[in-house]
């Protein structure tokens, strides 16, 4: 200045950049429906010999409520106090306008050393998803938190509990004139699931598995039954995830593919039913939740041909060729 005195200020703020690794997620799971995560930032004076005070209040926190705008799940902390990311653009904002930036140095010019820790992960229903709640009704254990030493990188490994669903298929085979089945149609089932998104709306249905009872297997079942023209089997779906990564229950439904069942009518219903008890129309049974394996089926499907063609007609005709004055 005019008096020849230079003033050096050490108030240049620092940006702490971190990265989140999500592993073992279901294929194609959207970033917008990932859980809310809160990070805590602690600091100490470099070279002071002091330990980080993880039992005390952090210098800053960051809550990410929308991961869709964060490329490679990279985020930043810019302010002391609460930092928030809650839009699809990944913008960091302070909780209040008067929050200062993160200092790089102390007032004495000593360098601060920062460390980042993940403090909590919560689902769309507000429950902790890392098993930190006080009871099974107050938390879900869906993620393992793995913090990588000496970096601002945290990994969450998804591991939903799994269960099974099974479908009972009853197929009535119509006989032809020779008292043998006209055909042995193959049977195919598709298993779909949905969950409640972070916005409170159901997700689009996702095809999870397909199970087939082949024509050869249907014929083998018929030959094992002897005189009966009604055959049945149970098809199972195992290792089905019970929860989506945001903590919402996966709700499954099974649908019969009627591509191979021309001329057959279909009835279905929830539960392990006998043929005479399957009275519901359609070809889909929903509202299914995976569970531990058991003998009873979760849904029953019945196929039968109401009317079998027993009378046939013969068509005859004559073909006339015009062959260019008998040249051929």
Task: Label the predicted regions.
Residues 1-328:
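Solvent-exposed loop/turn and edge beta-strand elements of beta-rich ligand-binding domains
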């Amino acid at each position: 200045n005019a008096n020849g005195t230079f003033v050096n200020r050490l108030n240049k703020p620092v940006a702490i950049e971190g990265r989140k690794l999500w592993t073992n997620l279901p294929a194609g799971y959207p970033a917008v429906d990932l859980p809310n995560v809160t990070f805590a930032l602690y600091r100490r004076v470099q070279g002071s010999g002091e330990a980080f005070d993880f039992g005390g209040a952090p210098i800053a926190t960051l809550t990410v409520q929308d991961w869709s705008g964060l490329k490679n799940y990279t985020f930043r902390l810019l302010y002391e106090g609460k930092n928030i990311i809650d839009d699809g653009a990944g913008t960091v904002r302070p909780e209040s306008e008067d929050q200062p930036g993160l200092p790089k140095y102390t007032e004495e010019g000593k360098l601060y050393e920062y460390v980042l820790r993940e403090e909590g992960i919560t689902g769309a229903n507000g429950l902790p998803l890392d098993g930190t709640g006080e009871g099974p009704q107050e938390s879900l254990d869906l993620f393992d938190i793995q913090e990588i030493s000496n970096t601002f990188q945290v990994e969450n490994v998804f591991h939903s509990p799994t269960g099974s669903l099974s479908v009972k298929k009853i197929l009535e085979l119509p006989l032809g004139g020779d008292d043998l089945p006209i055909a042995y149609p193959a049977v195919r089932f598709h298993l779909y699931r949905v969950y409640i998104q972070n916005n409170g709306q159901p997700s689009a249905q996702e095809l999870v598995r397909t199970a087939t009872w082949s024509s050869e297997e249907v014929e083998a079942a018929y030959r094992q039954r002897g005189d009966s023209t009604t055959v049945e089997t149970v098809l199972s779906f195992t290792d089905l995830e019970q929860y989506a990564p945001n903590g919402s229950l996966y709700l499954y439904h099974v649908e019969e593919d009627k591509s191979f069942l021309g001329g057959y009518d279909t009835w279905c219903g929830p539960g392990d039913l006998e043929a005479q008890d399957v009275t519901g129309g359609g070809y889909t049974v929903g509202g299914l939740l995976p569970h531990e394996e058991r003998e009873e089926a979760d849904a029953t499907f019945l196929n039968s041909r109401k009317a079998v063609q027993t009378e046939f007609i013969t068509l005859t005709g004559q073909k006339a060729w015009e062959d260019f004055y008998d040249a051929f």
